[in-house]
């Protein structure tokens, strides 16, 4: 927001922006409109009505196809885990929502066991600390965190992975000094001392979620960072699962080549940037723009990696 404020203070001819938070910047966009500065969104947009154009991948279509491909990889049944790069951007929300909708409509035997939002570590720390410490769960068996976020539920309405371990009292009424264990066998309570949320690392958070569900067969990751986080998790836990994700940096390509990633949504970053500049220039000149410019995507697999058309899109 501060960067946008600085740029608007220079009164540019137009602004092109990838909106990281759908609820942010509306005041700035209003100020831009008052100053006759057109705003074009690219990669990730918002519902703001004053945008001159939205230039991006069709995230919903790509996510639905990702669900189909992951379903095929896991045999159309079983548990999967989602790694979502954030909980606020339009691109992340669209990729998650459309993926869920496709599974619900066509693959009822696939259960989303856990979802890890990469921008909500503190929430996850609170939830997991509560589970580790054996705190009481909410109505319906859900364990809420500080913001009331509940665990993923299976299709039977029960929380995926069960509840935290409750400490028992000795016969004399005094609490026993005992250790609780998480799904992976890690000691989480010792001598009656509670685990503090902020002492749990991100790796421990993810591993805890993963260890609760040892039968996870697939992972859906919504951008390059999420794919890498999924790969790191599988490596730490010496586990295997099908991975379907977005983007294609060098680490992802290496994982694709050696079979650790099944397939990737390859976007068109050059085309997206080019189209955003053209749309911004047209808006500055009061020329018409398409409301939505779809820059397309292709599926990248180990077999298609060396195709000439694929190589043109890699960055």
Task: Spell out what each predicted region is.
Residues 1-315:
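A residue-level marker of the well-folded mature domains of exported/periplasmic proteins
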């Amino acid at each position: 927001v501060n960067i946008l404020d600085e740029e608007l203070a220079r009164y540019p001819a137009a602004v092109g922006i990838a909106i990281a938070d759908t609820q942010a910047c509306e005041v700035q966009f209003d100020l831009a409109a008052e100053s006759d500065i057109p705003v074009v969104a690219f990669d990730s947009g918002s519902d703001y009505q004053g945008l001159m154009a939205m230039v991006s991948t069709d995230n919903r279509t790509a996510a639905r196809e990702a669900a189909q491909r992951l379903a095929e990889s896991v045999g159309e049944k079983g548990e999967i885990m989602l790694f979502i790069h954030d909980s606020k951007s339009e691109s992340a929300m669209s990729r998650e929502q459309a993926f869920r909708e496709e599974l619900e409509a066509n693959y009822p035997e696939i259960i989303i066991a856990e979802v890890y939002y990469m921008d909500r570590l503190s929430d996850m720390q609170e939830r997991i600390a509560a589970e580790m410490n054996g705190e009481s769960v909410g109505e319906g068996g859900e364990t809420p965190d500080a913001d009331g976020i509940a665990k993923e539920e299976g299709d039977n309405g029960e929380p995926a992975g069960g509840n935290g371990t409750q400490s028992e009292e000795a016969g004399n009424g005094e609490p026993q000094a005992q250790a609780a264990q998480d799904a992976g066998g890690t000691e989480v309570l010792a001598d009656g001392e509670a685990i503090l949320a902020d002492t749990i690392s991100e790796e421990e958070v993810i591993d805890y979620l993963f260890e609760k569900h040892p039968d996870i067969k697939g992972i859906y990751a919504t951008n390059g960072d999420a794919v890498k986080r999924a790969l790191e998790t599988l490596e730490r836990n010496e586990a295997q699962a099908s991975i379907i994700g977005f983007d294609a940096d060098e680490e992802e390509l290496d994982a694709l080549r050696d079979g650790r990633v099944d397939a990737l949504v390859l976007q068109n970053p050059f085309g997206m940037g080019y189209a955003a500049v053209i749309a911004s220039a047209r808006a500055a000149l009061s020329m018409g723009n398409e409301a939505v410019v779809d820059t397309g995507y292709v599926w990248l697999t180990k077999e298609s990696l060396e195709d000439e058309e694929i190589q043109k899109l890699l960055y």
